[in-house]
Amino acid sequence: MIDLKTEYAGLKLRNPLIAGSSGMTNNPERNKEFEKAGVGAIVLKSLFEEQIEMQSSNLLKDSDYPEASDYVQEYVKVNQVNEYLELIKKTKALCTIPIIASINCYKADNWIDFARQIELAGADALELNVF
């Protein structure tokens, strides 16, 4: 059989096939299936700062308590980031191939904060989704 091993962004891959960021890569068990199917790495579904803020806004739009705004925004942000970190940890526990996290932010401090937390969660690399 042909040896398809390669290196991408410093990661050693068994082949150059990478499951790209999508709703399909948002589940640890499905990611294990991708690994079994032969992909060389997985890019997890992107964590979008804008999506986190939109979820907060939707929760607050009909609220009669504007003073709760800061609390709700921070709660939603922490919850969404923690869910993403759990996705990384669970996928890393199930898979032996490189796991690449992906973030999209528009505030400088969130790029840095999210990246640090993702590194600590064990992602092998980080895609900066800057579309």
Regions found by a protein language model. Name each.
Residues 3-131:
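Active-site entrance/lid segments in N-terminal catalytic domains of soluble metabolic enzymes
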